């Protein structure tokens, strides 16, 4: 099965440095690897966001931090939007 391409928004790249500093780099990389294989795989569970964030998905890095992403199904691309803040 062909893997999905991951594309990182500028803020997500900046967030990753914070994630590493907080000791959550391995957890984030594990989630990114899951997204690369299948962005709809469960477990771990994902949340389909609503309201202003409609079209985005979220997975927990830990209790406080979320990995937020968008899935472009037609071209098999996952756009990583954020990895630090809680839905901002």
Predicted regions: what they are:
Residues 2-11, 17-18, 22-30, 43, ...:
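Enriched for short, Lys/Arg-rich terminal
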Residues 37-39:
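Blade/loop signatures of beta-propeller domains
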């Amino acid at each position: 099965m062909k893997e999905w391409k991951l594309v990182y928004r500028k803020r997500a790249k900046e967030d990753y440095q914070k994630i590493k500093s907080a000791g959550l780099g391995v957890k984030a990389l594990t989630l990114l690897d899951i997204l690369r294989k299948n962005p709809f795989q469960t477990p771990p569970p994902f949340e389909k966001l609503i309201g202003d964030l409609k079209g985005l998905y979220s997975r927990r890095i830990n209790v406080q931090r979320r990995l937020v992403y968008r899935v472009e199904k037609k071209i098999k691309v996952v756009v990583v939007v954020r990895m630090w803040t809680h839905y901002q």
